[in-house]
From Swiss-Prot:
One of its GO terms (biological process) is negative regulation of cell growth. Belongs to the OKL38 family. Signal peptide: none annotated. This is Oxidative stress-induced growth inhibitor 2. Monooxygenase catalytic activity. May be involved in meiosis or the maturation of germ cells. The gene is OSGIN2. It is found in: Midbody. SUPFAM superfamilies: FAD/NAD(P)-binding domain. Ubiquitous. Expressed at higher levels in testis and ovary. No monooxygenase catalytic activity in the absence of NADPH. One of its GO terms (molecular function) is growth factor activity. Its cofactor is NADPH. Keywords: FAD, Flavoprotein, Meiosis, Monooxygenase, NADP, Oxidoreductase.
Length: 505
């Protein structure tokens, strides 16, 4: 039974949860699934192609993966995540996927309701998070099967909708619908609250040396979940919920643990240059796509400036190119830079992105020629400023400056999470505490097996916040957090059963 009413968070401002999850994208959904008692076991007929890992799995076949030593299981595994549990869980769900194989998962899932840990998932929109806001005309970078969550194959869901997959990659809107349906079919709705906006998350008291040092004002205010199990108010979460009539109703919750699953798409990164706030400068694909769809750029002679060398910038290039809008494409790297994402994508699977990369290499600007009619790339260039007359100033790596008249500009150089509800915007949680949190450059620093923040006990982070930008890998975060919380819950039960303390946390 949910701890608060389905329609509202605010009826009882004294409610305390063992876990509050902030963010209802795939990270938050997967964590809710596992906290609800779903447990992964090695399938009876399964043989993992990695013989060493398979031997380890056989040693404890009777135990769920949640109850096993994740450090031991993940030792020696390699993959496209810096977090070992993410690599482990991915290789269990998609064995040898990076070698081009489509082996079935070696896991099967059981619902064990006695493992349920009460929690609430707070999100701004419907379950699926930012996937509901992505440009619908572009294909996902990952295969549909890599976007799926445990227990419901994406292809099976598509078949149930009487639709067929035209290829392995799918539209973001399909993925968004899948995530929303997943929450419903898995019976997770009671844990989710939509239209919620967090304004502050603050610690009420701190532990010292892992002993319970309590704030005397709040030490007796706890919610009893079971007869012998009390939870502590480590965190206060404040915010508001937007209700049907558009009004905002404030709420206040308390939690023993908070899990940050916000993703990193909230705040587009800026160049921080003169004129960047002019209305002709966009910072997201939805903005740019809307301008094209509304015909604002139709028939324009002046080119669109696109800044960035990632896949979102490539999407913008394709969007403009396919709409017959000339493009100036500016990026700071060399086209031969081995870290360019295009070099990591097979040509057969991603022909449209390799088309962009081919243009980046072969249609670059030179001082001896004018702009090409459809597309011109400017490798190793940066934008110095935007002018009110819709001009921009570019500078090459050698210092040469050029001025161009534009019809619009799109700056797509990454994004930052909105962690304004944390002290110092959450910067103190990162590897570089003086810089904003980013997926690649400065992720949240965590224990890589529990996903607990190094700088803050009882605060967890998963998904893009810790560098796992692909859905394939963020599921490992849910496994790490669930194992950590389940282990602590067992210790708490054991402590009470043996007569330790007075039962008040």
């Amino acid at each position: 039974m949910p701890l608060v009413e389905e329609t509202s968070l605010l009826e009882d401002s004294s409610v305390t949860f063992p876990v509050v999850i902030i963010g209802n994208g795939p990270s938050g959904i997967c964590l809710s699934y596992m906290l609800s008692g779903y447990r992964p076991y090695l399938s009876s007929e399964a043989i993992h192609p990695n013989t060493i890992l398979n031997s380890k799995l056989e040693e404890a076949r009777h135990l769920s993966i949640v109850d096993q030593d994740l450090e031991y299981l993940s030792e020696g595994l390699e993959g496209r995540s810096s977090n070992p549990v993410a690599v482990l869980f991915d290789t269990l769900l998609h064995p040898d996927a990076d070698f081009g194989y489509d082996y079935p998962s070696v896991l099967h899932w059981k619902l064990e309701q006695h493992h349920y840990i009460p929690h609430v998932v707070l999100g701004k929109g419907p379950p699926g998070g930012a996937w509901h806001n992505m440009e619908g005309s572009m294909l996902t970078i990952s295969f549909g099967s890599w976007m799926e969550l445990p227990g419901l194959k994406f292809k099976d869901w598509v078949s149930s909708k009487r639709r067929s997959l035209k290829g392995d990659r799918v539209m973001p809107e399909e993925i968004a619908r899948y995530y929303k349906h997943y929450v419903k079919v898995m019976g997770l709705q009671k844990n989710f609250r939509e239209n919620t906006y967090i304004t502050s998350v603050s610690r009420l008291y701190r532990d010292q040396d892992d002993d319970d040092i309590q704030d005397r004002d709040i030490s007796t205010k706890h919610l009893q979940i079971e007869k012998s199990n009390f939870i502590k108010r480590n965190w206060e979460i404040r915010g508001y919920q937007r209700i049907a009539d558009g009004s905002h109703v404030p709420f206040c919750l308390f939690a023993e643990n908070v899990a940050l699953a916000t993703g990193t798409l909230d705040s587009p990164a800026h160049l921080e240059i003169e004129g960047e706030d002019f209305p002709f400068v966009f910072h997201s694909m939805p903005e740019f796509g809307a301008a094209i769809n509304k015909g604002k750029l139709r028939g324009k002679v002046d080119p669109v400036l696109i800044v960035g060398s990632g896949l979102t910038a490539a999407d913008a290039v394709l969007c403009a190119y396919n709409s017959n809008i000339p493009v100036i494409h500016v990026f700071r790297r060399r086209v031969t830079d081995p870290s360019l994402i295009f070099k990591q994508l097979p040509k057969k699977l991603y022909p449209e992105y390799h088309k962009v990369y081919h243009m980046m290499c072969t249609q670059s600007y030179s001082v001896d020629s004018n702009l090409l009619s459809d597309y011109t790339s400017f490798p190793e260039h940066r934008v110095l400023s935007f002018k009110s007359d819709m001009k921009c100033v570019l500078q090459s790596v050698s210092g040469l400056k050029k001025i161009f008249k534009l019809s619009a500009a799109v700056v797509l150089i990454g994004s930052h999470p909105n962690l304004s509800f944390l002290k110092d915007q959450g910067c103190y949680l990162g590897h570089k505490s003086s810089q904003p949190i980013t997926c690649k450059g400065n992720p949240v620093e965590i224990d890589t097996y529990t996903y607990e923040c190094i700088k803050e006990a009882n605060l967890f982070a998963l998904g893009p916040l810790v560098g796992d930008n692909f859905v394939r890998f963020l599921k490992g975060g849910a496994l790490g957090v669930t194992r950590c919380l389940a282990t602590r819950q067992k210790k708490k039960h054991l402590f009470v059963e043996r007569g330790g303390g007075d039962g008040i946390a």
